[in-house]
Amino acid sequence: EMSYVRTIKSFDRNITINVDFNYLLTASLLSLPVASEIPTTVGVTYSLALLPDSKMRQRVTDSRVGIASVSKLTFDNNIAKSKQTLIAQRWNLIPQNLKAYEQGKLSKPVKPICFYIDDAFPVEWKNAIKQGVELWNKAFEQAGYQKAIEALDFPKNDHNFDADDIAYSCIRYVPSTAEKVTSSFLANPQTGEIINASVFVPANVGDQIYRWLFLGSAASDATMRTSHLPQDKFNQGLKYMVACEVGRSLGLLDNIG
């Protein structure tokens, strides 16, 4: 009876329910009690969404290409036999000028991939975040798309905009002690179409950027031999970390080794 629904939001294609679960936490370490009935609150968000009305053409995953996939299991008339197919997870980009695209020329997509940048970010962070997102346009040009991805501020005069609506992919500011930039995306399990993505940048991201740059470059870069991270180095690191997570949000797997 201590848990309750905090908010319910309804949109055109999804609903979001925020719930606060309250517990009395008891914990032990090495059989020794370390906490007894400590009041604890855990916030959980549930989202239910309709799948797109139009179905994107599936593409079977090629193991030679680092693309995320969703598993699809099918059964034939022999109920004891099943087949697993891995469907590539990707954004549904459609060229505006199909004729030019087929001739190998660049074309803008009908609907570009758009990430909205949280208003809660410090102003001096935003340009690095925008650069980290739009850096991927160079890669999309190799696939024939011009200005395929963009980063915009939260709309100020659009009363229909809500960051909890899956119609909008957002880069969110997280006021926590965490240091690592993370991401997630939502894909249609039937087709693999990515329909929403989120990138989360914590307030203490600068601590991780400092450690990475100090360990990797302090021996040759005198500006890193200090306890204070220079703003230009912070921007460089933030751009890299955002670009990395946006890449994952595009359905790309880590290129490790």
What are these regions (language model features)?
Residues 120-148:
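Zn2+-dependent metallopeptidase catalytic core
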Residues 134-137, 192, 236, 240-255:
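Active-site recognition of the HExxH zinc-binding catalytic motif
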